[in-house]
Amino acid sequence: MAIPDYARLYLALYKRQVPLRRESVYVLFSLKNFFYRYKIRIFALYFKDMRIISGSHRGKQLIAPKNLPVRPTTDFAKESLFNILNNYFYLDSIKVLDLFAGTGNISYEFGSRGCPDITAVDSHAGCVQYIHKTATALSYPIEVIKSDAFTFLERNLSSYDVIFADPPYDLPEQDLERLVSLVFERNLLAPDGLLIIEHSAKISMEENPYFDHDRRYGGTAFSLFNNV
């Protein structure tokens, strides 16, 4: 993908590759506003940026450290996900578990929409630190736990209305099935709850006995599971 000169300038300023004088700061913020206004997301190739879509912090931009090993859910897929959730729950009265939380992208969206009880789990220390810092700054009720997702499920005793998992897209299919099994065998989902797994659209989980349906958006799929 060819990057226009103005985008190269933005990236150079953002990454401090050119002197950051007063006029440079003006250009930096002007270009940033231009990119977001017209949805030109070239710099998203270089920085892990997020946008809170709705709720108390609607439209707020968050930029995570670029060295975090994550792949944030896209705005389009995230908006579609929460449209689904709004048909099932009052988000201001549910208990949520966010597995493979990464930058905390999904947890922040729940927090902005008034969810009172959110647990975010990730095994990467940098991700855990970033989520804790951001949740504190935004005053979101997010408990952040550093743990492997499977270990957490094996040891946890609580149940949740929504369990969302966004594992790496290259996670073997048998591990995706294991994740579903742990949730239901250990009764970690409330009776009317939903388990949602984000995964590559190349994978189908419809043979799982707890599978309800899936939604596909480009290369992303959300598989929904419930108590049957």
Please report, for each region that a protein language model flagged, where it lies by residue.
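Short hydrophobic targeting helices and cationic amphipathic motifs
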Residues: 6, 11, 34-37
